[in-house]
Amino acid sequence: MKSSKLNPVTTHKEFNGISGALGITIGLPTLTVLFYLLCNQTYSIHGINVDFAKIKSQLPITQDELWQLVFDKTCWSAYLAWFFILVILDYLLPGKSLNGVKLRDGTVLNYKINGLSMSSLLIVLLLARLFQSNSDSSLEYYLPELQFIYDNQLQLIIICFLFSFMLAVFVYIISFIPLAKPNGIGTKERILSINGNTGNPFYDWFIGRELNPRIGSWDIKLFCELRPGMLLWLLINLSCLHYQYHNLGYVTDSMIVVNLLQAFYIFDGVLNEEGCLTMIDITTDGFGFMLSFGDLAWVPWTYSLQARYLSIKGNEVNLGWTLSLLIVGLQALGFYIFRSANKQKSDFRQGKLPHLKSIQTKTGSKLLVEGWWGLSQHINYLGDWLIGLSWCLPTGFQTPLTYFYVIYFASLLIHRQVRDEMKCRAKYGEDWEKYEKLVPYKIIPYVY
């Protein structure tokens, strides 16, 4: 593998290297399909007892059945239309122009932030279709598009996986094509991820070789982070609500709570997309299969598990006003911790909170040790986790399956914390040891 000043060779492989990358590449898509097989109109798990015969009965037996499942023309057409219409809208819709962080070649990338116009258009189109459908159909509040999503979930899950696989191959290939114009140091090298330049094709494809793959000014990574998967998650949830209404004749309060809480989270992310420009996904990680699959398949199909579970006959949960308000309050608390902690750190970095105690490091930066950030090193992670817990609680306690998200998310946050700690320990040295004595807790104050 050729090393350069701009793109040094990656020597440390994350996720236990190639074996871990292979395990994730096979395991997570399999898990996504398994979650569907465990929770759908044909079979829904109760408790921890799995009926393997019913799972097996849902799988294709013949080659023709497998072909029809994987290459359903209608589903492929629908998904490709969804993805590329969003691409066109992302390019055409107005938005403010913001610069990202400074890159290794001294340049900065410009991003168009148009989450507000994109979200507004989606809401208007949904309401317009609902009004039109009511005029054309004898069924009240019936949307064939939402019914299509609900009826073809397994096909769409497989399509999302295959598309994310192909997208990862595409960005890996273009990472080897020289830039049309010189970069900030006068060469035509693309800026590669510090984690994705090992020289092993499979690992670099998985972790992401190029830092910011673009077609012209259109940024593939930021688009996938907040557009196709996040907005599809919203539509999947609505399809579950839609299905429950047309089968029960009403919508349960638990379904309403899940839809409202997750819709708030989705729109909060899309409307505050400028915050992504300083996140590790954008600034440090390359865009490969890990992010492609996570954004396009994992997020919409595993994060919507609670709504799908509640839509199934016999799984209805009636919370009542008290429990509903308590769960909403839990998400509000999580958001308050998450947002206020992040704002405090941002304000401190901008010099707006000079009275807060900090450690002056030898690198020239400061480590905050007061306020939210005196409670734990990643107090914002706690807020984020509480938000996820509020999504799971409306499903009751009939099966641990609907609590997978908070278990998975906890492991993800701990992995991020350990990863961040290793980098900070290497960067700050003795100053980090002083910091750990003043802020000993990692995420949860007095616990971890």
Swiss-Prot record:
UniProt cross-references to PROSITE patterns, sorted A to Z: STEROL_REDUCT_1 (PS01017), STEROL_REDUCT_2 (PS01018)
A Gene Ontology cellular-component term: endoplasmic reticulum membrane
UniProt: NADP(+) binding residues: 345, 349, 368, 373, 380-381, 420, 424-428, 435
Gene3D superfamilies according to UniProt: 1.20.120.1630
Compartments where located: Endoplasmic reticulum membrane
Broad class of enzyme this protein falls into: oxidoreductase
One GO-annotated biological process of the protein: ergosterol biosynthetic process
Knocked-out gene: effects: Leads to the accumulation of ignosterol (ergosta-8,14-dienol), and of a new sterol, ergosta-8,14,22-trienol. Results in slow growth and significant increased sensitivity to an allylamine antifungal and to selected cellular inhibitors including cycloheximide, cerulenin, fluphenazine, and brefeldin A. Slightly increases resistance to azoles. Significantly reduces pathogenicity in a mouse model system and fails to produce germ tubes upon incubation in human serum.
Keyword Transcription regulation carried by entry: no
Name of one Pfam family that matches: ERG4_ERG24
EC number(s) on file: 1.3.1.70
Keywords recorded for this protein, A-Z: Endoplasmic reticulum, Lipid biosynthesis, Lipid metabolism, Membrane, NADP, Oxidoreductase, Steroid biosynthesis, Steroid metabolism, Sterol biosynthesis, Sterol metabolism, Transmembrane, Transmembrane helix
Membrane topology, from the record: Multi-pass membrane protein
Principal location listed in the UniProt entry: endoplasmic reticulum
Membrane-spanning intervals of the chain: 18-38, 75-95, 108-128, 157-177, 251-271, 279-299, 318-338, 394-414
Molecular function in Gene Ontology: Delta14-sterol reductase activity
Cited function: ERG24 reduces the C14=C15 double bond of 4,4-dimethyl-cholesta-8,14,24-trienol to produce 4,4-dimethyl-cholesta-8,24-dienol. The third module or late pathway involves the ergosterol synthesis itself through consecutive reactions that mainly occur in the endoplasmic reticulum (ER) membrane. Firstly, the squalene synthase ERG9 catalyzes the condensation of 2 farnesyl pyrophosphate moieties to form squalene, which is the precursor of all steroids.
Family per record: Belongs to the ERG4/ERG24 family.
This protein's name: Delta(14)-sterol reductase ERG24
Organism: Candida albicans (strain SC5314 / ATCC MYA-2876) (Yeast)
Lineage, opening ranks: Eukaryota, Fungi, Dikarya, Ascomycota, Saccharomycotina
Gene assigned in the entry: ERG24
